[in-house]
Amino acid sequence: MTVDAATVRRIAHLARIAVDDAEVPHLQGELNAILAFVEQLQEVNVDGVEPMTSVMPMEMKKRADVVNDGGIADKIVGNAPVTDDHFFLVPKVVE
């Protein structure tokens, strides 16, 4: 796949980048070099290779997933002006 001058101008327009006519050939060469490198990467055989999330192998720290109320429910409900059985009571707003 090669990039022509019209494609360079279209990419510049989509990216909202001002490109002079003198810059188009240089950018065309740069984009073609990038695409050539991507095509070269596609030729690499990666069958059986595990995908990596990092260059350095790391294991995620795991913790027990324990459900709790935080132990401060009484303090939270205590901030409300009116409560009933650990529920906030608010004025009725819809008739």
UniProtKB/Swiss-Prot annotation:
Heterotrimer of A, B and C subunits. InterPro entries: Asp/Glu-ADT_sf_sub_c, GatC. Its EC number is 6.3.5.-. One of its GO terms (molecular function) is glutaminyl-tRNA synthase (glutamine-hydrolyzing) activity. Belongs to the GatC family. The keyword Protein biosynthesis applies. This is Aspartyl/glutamyl-tRNA(Asn/Gln) amidotransferase subunit C. HAMAP family: GatC. The gene is gatC. It comes from Nitrobacter hamburgensis (strain DSM 10229 / NCIMB 13809 / X14). It holds the Pfam family GatC. GO terms for biological process: glutaminyl-tRNAGln biosynthesis via transamidation; regulation of translational fidelity; translation. Keywords: ATP-binding, Ligase, Nucleotide-binding, Protein biosynthesis. It catalyses: L-glutamyl-tRNA(Gln) + L-glutamine + ATP + H2O = L-glutaminyl-tRNA(Gln) + L-glutamate + ADP + phosphate + H(+); L-aspartyl-tRNA(Asn) + L-glutamine + ATP + H2O = L-asparaginyl-tRNA(Asn) + L-glutamate + ADP + phosphate + 2 H(+). Allows the formation of correctly charged Asn-tRNA(Asn) or Gln-tRNA(Gln) through the transamidation of misacylated Asp-tRNA(Asn) or Glu-tRNA(Gln) in organisms which lack either or both of asparaginyl-tRNA or glutaminyl-tRNA synthetases. The reaction takes place in the presence of glutamine and ATP through an activated phospho-Asp-tRNA(Asn) or phospho-Glu-tRNA(Gln). The keyword Kinase does not apply. It is an enzyme of class 6 (ligase).
